[in-house]
Amino acid sequence: MKKFIETIKNIFKIEELRKRIVYTLLLLLVYRLGSFVVLPGIDPTQLGKLQSQASEGLLALLNMFSGGAFGNASIFALGVMPYISASIVIQLLGIMVPYFQKLQREGESGRRKMNQWTRYLTIVILVLQGPAYMANLHAQLPESAFLFHGFSYNIFATIVLIGGTMFIMWLGERITDRGLGNGISLIIMVGIVARLPFAIVSEAGARLSQSAGGGVLMLIVELVVLFFVFVATIALVQGTRKIPVQYAKRIIGNKQYGGVRQYIPLKVNAAGVMPIIFAQAIMMFPLLLSGFNATRGLAATLSNSTGFWYNLLYGLMVIAFTYFYTAVTVNPTNMAEDMKKNGGFIPGIKPGKKTAEYLDSIMSRITLPGSFFLAIVAILPAFAKMLGISNQFASFFGGTTLLILVGVILDTLQQIESHLLMRHYDGLMKTGRLKGRSGM
């Protein structure tokens, strides 16, 4: 404990790290305050029905991603999901369309162009979602809740919603560039964490008020299960398969280099949280197309987060996207070529093509159980709801919520660890190494 306190003190001794932490916290505070700023022209005292709607089904997830802004009719109500959806589409185009494939190979300049295309597509999605959100507001709120009416007000409110999401994107970029961690990921995480106390209090209140008794025991069981799910999720995020690599001995001057065995850590879940986000973004399309108010037909079936068909399709998409995103982020051919250039080889495997094939086969084998476990984590909240756990609390039993929390926390701690070790301070872990996960 004493060493941990000393490490915390060391964090604030490093001026650059201290400034980055303060800058990040200030921008996250701006985001949280903005989540409570209601759209101009709406009476904030009449949002009860909207908040009730935003606590059920897929809308509860959308509300959580926006930090409660969706249910507050806030200027940030559309959150970052349009940006995430646009990122998904652009990444898919980077595989299928030659122009975007070329941009991916152009390094930093290509990345900037890809980001620009992502922003353009985000605006297109916002132009579609803004009116849909306003239509939902008119359906859920009484006419007296609106101080202004008519087409011109809806246009004005849509522009404000678009501006709100663009401002969130700007905050995320500033945090990534000048703060600590991935900005968009931290913004999503803050929205999730902000809902956790309410979810726990709500579940505790429901259990303690049970007249039949046993509520306290059930609450304890739920918290214990949540703890073990959290630990299992950390194991999934951190799990690696170490591939031994031998480097040839080289003598430069009077010093000998190489000749020692090292390891390539291949992640069991190289795709991180992206497969679940991809799958959820697609599963939300029917809900978005129905104006956030799917009550019957195919849209209702595919929006029922506890339904059989929803979870079957959701789980299959998570597995498919895990393979897809792993193939995008892990390139065995490049790994084999880099290894060969540096005089490295896997014992018993020929350098070059054979090494690439070996790495590809290993990735395929470890991705299979990783994808199935990721799918189980994704649908765990649905099972929790079926067992009578409240919608808000059940969302923390797995899925995007838990993976984002674990992943973002580990990534941020890894950055802090790097700053400490670079300046010869003890890290946060005894080993001095804290593994993160793939960026979001």
Where are the predicted features?
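N-terminal cationic and glycine-rich segments that engage phosphates or anionic surfaces
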Residues: M1-Q104, S109-M440
